[in-house]
Amino acid sequence: MIRIAIDVMGGDFGPDVAIPGAAKALERHNDVTFLLYGQKSKCDPILAQYPALREKSVFHDCEVSVSMDEKPSQALRRGRYVSSMWRAIEAVKLGEADVAVSAGNTGALMAMAKFCLRTMARVERPAIAGIWPTLKGESIVLDVGATIGADSQQLLDFALMGGAMARALFDIDRPTVGLLNVGVEEVKGQEEVREAGRLIREADLGTIDYRGFVEGDDIGKGTVDVVVTEGFTGNIALKAAEGTARQITTLLREAISRSFFAKIGYILAKSAFDVLREKMDPRKVNGGVFLGLNGIVIKSHGGTDAIGFASAVDVGYDMVHNGLTAKIENDLKIYHARRLPPPAPEALVADEE
């Protein structure tokens, strides 16, 4: 049984989205139980509408919640130990839950997750990994906002963790990985990116298939399974892609409504448009994964609806079901074991004596 802790008060719509979203996820996964953290007075009337969810849930009353515009430092001081966000994360730390899901303030969620769960041994900075629809299916892009200006060693860590996530999510033995750059030539790009490419190549990581540098358009093409970048660039790429998807949807809607014949054409091609809409629906790939922590935390978009929140719960379920944390820990252990210097000759002699 997989145990999922939910910050019910997080996001723009709080329990109005989180509770129906959890109920939708429950319809797809009958081997889960939920730990719901929120304000009882606001949640009880909504939870009463979903008896199946209520039966599979334990509710924890939390009068304190984190607002979407609250500074991370302020949220940590005010909400530590008592807020719905903190207590959902803490449930993972205490072993009461396998994963925490929140649509709340990203900065506050990362601050609380780092403070409560701590980073894995030898991981300098955590990353947020997003799932990206591509022409070939889906890919993983990280970091999309956790670490601004990552150095070469941190980018190598991201490659390892992203590869582990791809194996957990896509069931790929050796996922392909590329470093996002301004060109595919080895002489291009910032020094940190070029150095990261050298480190990954020389490390000869058996868990991933490093394909070198990739460009921005390679993300949508699905050129590689995992695209690695630092948080500033990754977040801009993510927001640009989301904006482009909304722009295309708006332009199509305007074009269809422009004339009678355009409407007839839409009716004739409706099935094709439905496929396009399904493919470009950001709710279907909602759920950023915090990688590099001693526990799994999923960040849902704050403005999503119940369908999108259910997708974030699905991601959390898949990460637990496929052993994400163990995969990352194992890959990091193998990599760092290879980096250890060989024992000195005198040490070998002493051991033999």
UniProtKB/Swiss-Prot annotation:
Q: Which domain of life is it from?
A: Bacteria
UniProt keyword list = Cytoplasm, Lipid biosynthesis, Lipid metabolism, Phospholipid biosynthesis, Phospholipid metabolism, Transferase
GO CC, sorted alphabetically, is: cytoplasm
Q: Which reaction does it catalyse?
A: a fatty acyl-[ACP] + phosphate = an acyl phosphate + holo-[ACP]
Q: Name one GO molecular function term.
A: phosphate:acyl-[acyl carrier protein] acyltransferase activity
Report the locations given in the UniProt record. Answer: Cytoplasm
Q: Which Pfam families match?
A: FA_synthesis
Functional pathway: Lipid metabolism; phospholipid metabolism
InterPro entries of this UniProt entry? FA_synthesis, Phospholipid_synth_PlsX-like
Gene Ontology biological process terms from the UniProt entry: fatty acid biosynthetic process; phospholipid biosynthetic process
* Enzyme Commission (EC) number: 2.3.1.274
Q: What is its main location?
A: cytoplasm
Q: What does this protein do?
A: Catalyzes the reversible formation of acyl-phosphate (acyl-PO(4)) from acyl-[acyl-carrier-protein] (acyl-ACP). This enzyme utilizes acyl-ACP as fatty acyl donor, but not acyl-CoA.
Identify its protein family: Belongs to the PlsX family.
Q: How does it assemble?
A: Homodimer. Probably interacts with PlsY.
> Under what name is this protein listed?
Phosphate acyltransferase
The organism is: Agrobacterium fabrum (strain C58 / ATCC 33970) (Agrobacterium tumefaciens (strain C58))
